[in-house]
């Protein structure tokens, strides 16, 4: 592609992204706490007003997380963050900045890891493609309120999605770097992120290890390698996720559900929901954006050193992995 044209398109895409973000951030000062923001934040608010000690607030947030773990839900790290909602400190305007910033940064990071480090495209091409993906991720969310403005609900999903992208970047980078020190740091950070993400919502909680498991299988089948690093991270993740799933509070909450499908029924329900969601989510604008990306993606696929002997099988697996994100709500809610 003509480099001058690509540069102009990249600058235009970045300008559109910035302009589209400004209104989201500008709404921040007009936001206020709502619903579960008060429920989870009350103990920390009491600690803050009584002591103005950050340490006391962190302790109160942890105590609240463990209380919820025993009485309502096992998502230990999410409940900890919910208890520390910014409104306690009079900073609720930070909510869209935190959530939007995490989403933008994590998407660019994963894009850099895949496009630059793995596929070796130019910086300009990376900037253009990644910016379009960031623009789509931000502007095509199902609900701006639930994605960026309500801390309790948005943090539960948007932030944990962003953390998952960071973790994916680290897992890929581990296999690309030659530095022993970098591998050690990546291992420690990846393990910490795995434990933290596993304590979040069950949608991300189940979807992320499913993708990780298939990455391990792919390396076994296609590369004839045993990915001990990925296996170790998956084991850490699975242990932490089990701690969340088998929380006493989950049994209490599940007792309030009167009609629960079996695993097989939930599996097909998840597939149905994924198809329904895709049908609702893909419109003319989404199609247009992907059409713009087709020349780049086609060239990347052609130049890639990765070979897929059974492309339709990979497409099917990708769809099933996508459906896995709908399984927790189909089975337990």
Q: Which positions does each model-derived feature cover?
A:
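Transmembrane-helix motifs of polytopic, lipid-linked glycan transferases
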Residues: 98-124, 128, 166
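Hydrophobic core segments of transmembrane alpha-helices in multi-pass, intramembrane catalytic enzymes
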Residues: 103, 156-168, 207-215
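Membrane-interfacial loop-to-transmembrane alpha-helix junctions, especially the N-terminal start
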Residues: 9-10, 120-131, 182-186, 225-233, ...
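Aromatic-anchored segments of alpha-helical transmembrane domains
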Residues: 21, 133-140, 194-199, 236-246, ...
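Membrane-interface alpha helices of multi-pass inner-membrane proteins
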Residues: 185-202
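Transmembrane catalytic cores of multi-pass membrane glycosyltransferases
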Residues: 28-87, 93, 151, 202-304, ...
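Membrane-interface micro-motifs in multi-pass membrane enzymes
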Residues: 125-172, 284-287, 322-333
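Start-transfer (signal-anchor) and selected internal transmembrane alpha helices
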Residues: 1-22
């Amino acid at each position: 592609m003509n480099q001058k044209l690509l540069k102009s398109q990249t600058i235009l895409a970045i300008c559109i992204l910035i302009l589209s973000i400004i209104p989201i951030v500008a709404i921040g000062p007009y936001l206020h706490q709502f619903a579960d923001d008060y429920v989870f934040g009350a103990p920390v608010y009491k600690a803050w007003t009584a002591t103005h000690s950050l340490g006391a607030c962190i302790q109160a947030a942890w105590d609240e997380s463990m209380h919820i773990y025993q009485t309502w839900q096992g998502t230990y790290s999410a409940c900890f963050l919910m208890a520390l909602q910014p409104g306690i400190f009079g900073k609720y305007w930070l909510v869209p900045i935190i959530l939007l910033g995490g989403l933008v940064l994590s998407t660019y990071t994963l894009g850099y890891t895949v496009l630059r480090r793995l596929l070796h495209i130019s910086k300009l091409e990376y900037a253009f493609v990644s910016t379009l993906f960031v623009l789509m991720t931000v502007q095509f969310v199902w609900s701006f309120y639930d994605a960026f403005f309500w801390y309790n609900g948005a943090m539960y999903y948007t932030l944990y999605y962003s953390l998952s992208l960071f973790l994916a970047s680290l897992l890929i980078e581990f296999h690309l770097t030659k530095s022993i020190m970098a591998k050690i740091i990546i291992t420690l950070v990846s393990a910490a992120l795995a434990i933290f993400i596993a304590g979040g919502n069950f949608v991300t909680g189940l979807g992320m290890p499913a993708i990780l498991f298939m990455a391990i299988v792919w390396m076994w089948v296609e590369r004839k390698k045993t990915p001990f690093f990925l296996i170790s991270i998956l084991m850490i993740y699975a242990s932490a996720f089990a701690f969340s799933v088998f929380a006493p509070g989950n049994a209490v909450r599940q007792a309030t559900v009167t009609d629960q499908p079996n695993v097989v029924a939930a599996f097909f329900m998840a597939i149905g929901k994924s198809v329904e969601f895709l049908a609702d989510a893909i419109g003319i604008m989404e199609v247009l954006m992907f059409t713009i990306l087709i020349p780049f993606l086609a060239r990347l696929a052609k130049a890639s050193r990765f070979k897929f002997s059974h492309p339709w099988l990979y497409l099917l697996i990708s769809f099933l992995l996508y459906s896995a994100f709908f399984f927790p709500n189909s089975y337990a809610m």
